[in-house]
Swiss-Prot record:
It holds the Pfam family TM140. The lineage of its organism: Eukaryota, Metazoa, Chordata, Craniata, Vertebrata. Glycans are attached at residue 38. Its main location: membrane. Expression significantly higher in gliomas than in normal brain tissues. Residues 33-77, 136-150 are extracellular. Keywords: Glycoprotein, Membrane, Transmembrane, Transmembrane helix. It is a multi-pass membrane protein. Changing residue 112 to E: In a colorectal cancer sample; somatic mutation. Residues 1-11, 99-114, 172-185 are cytoplasmic. The chain crosses the membrane at residues 12-32, 78-98, 115-135, 151-171. This is Transmembrane protein 140. One of its GO terms (cellular component) is membrane.
Amino acid sequence: MAGPRPRWRDQLLFMSIIVLVIVVICLMFYALLWEAGNLTDLPNLRIGFYNFCLWNEDTSTLQCHQFPELEALGVPRVGLGLARLGVYGSLVLTLFAPQPLLLAQCNSDERAWRLAVGFLAVSSVLLAGGLGLFLSYVWKWVRLSLPGPGFLALGSAQALLILLLIAMAVFPLRAERAESKLESC
């Protein structure tokens, strides 16, 4: 016979979810802002959402390409724009998730909880779509042995977003009727 969970267990689950959201935000900030969106950053290759530099054998230097040259290499402008929109939009939506989570916990508001789940779900879809679209265009230059810390951070953020969604679905917010709203914060 399963009884109600103790209050401390609910608080521990909530704090774990908040910590995971903060870790995802930090990973995405690191990859997209600190690393400037570079997924591969080697001395002879730099490929990211805003950099596309390949090694030039003739001059023995790293040559960065802009859009007319990128389209000739097979990287469409619209595709790269959609990939950027997906990845950076994911960061923005993830930044909005902690506030509804805190409001849901303090006010026992299931609608705010669902809003936070929605933000994280759309963020996960945008990140996966943007990263997948970008990798589909640059796959001939980037191999699995070449990902840099930015790519690993985005991949980890995606995995944690999926884990967050699973945790939030398995352990939904439970409204507590017996306590006042001030005691629940």
